[in-house]
Amino acid sequence: KLLETRSLEQTGQWPEALAMSEKLHGSVAKSISSRPVRPGAGGVQVDLRPLLVAWEIGPFTELQAALKKQDSNRTKTALISLRQQCVTCHTVLGKTDIQLPEIQ
């Protein structure tokens, strides 16, 4: 959904990109709420809820604002930041096999 958001934004489909970003949020939030505490890479239990909150109030909020303003540069920057937080969370969980494509 991350790349779909970018693709829609790049083709000027701003309302659709905003809707896709909301689907992305829904998927992430659902995944975390279904199992908020998981084993981390080092064997320690990791509570993902604070990571979700940071994701929501940081790059996701910035993405929403950029899409609403139809600002391509700001949208790309927000998507890159959003992706980086996803990668960080996956790394904390030892899920380095889950690959997230680069944002172009």
Stretches with model-predicted labels:
Residues K1-Q104:
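Sequence context surrounding c-type heme c attachment/ligation sites in exported
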